[in-house]
């Protein structure tokens, strides 16, 4: 390795189950494991929030569930990137990051297919009046007389 310091990446502790197995087995960092210039370490948040102290020696953070707010920003000024594993910035104080020059990114492609499948499912359920029909079935014999009103719809 050169004299240059390693690029250190903190991975949200939420990427691991309690037994240490990965939550997302397909999120494989194996190909980077032998790279001498990159170092990965799992960092667990405290009370659902990343702590500044645990991030002092990192250049980047791959964030899953924990919150990252103004109090999470390390004083070392080394942290340059937060890659939010998911969509939305609801768990990241973007303004605080902007003020400290920390770039924040998301991964929208990761949820496009599941969101599309959910939307299509809702369209089919609503157009077929699934909720009304579900209530009729759950209502038992007392609601059976109403079934005729919904025949041929959906």
Question: What is the predicted role of each segment?
Answer:
Residues 100, 108-154:
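Phosphate-binding beta-alpha-beta segment of Rossmann-like dinucleotide-binding domains, i.e.
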Residues 90-100:
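Rossmann-fold NAD(P)-binding glycine/threonine-rich loop
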Residues 44-47, 64-68, 86-89:
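Short beta->alpha connector loops
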Residues 55-60, 77-79:
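Short acidic/histidine-rich motifs immediately flanking catalytic phosphotransfer sites
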Residues 15-16, 85-89, 109-112:
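Short, acidic/turn-prone active-site loops that include or flank metal/cofactor-
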Residues 67-79:
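Rossmann-fold NAD(P) dinucleotide-binding segment
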Residues 1-58:
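N-terminal glycine-/charge-rich "phosphate-binding" loop or analogous flexible N-terminal tail
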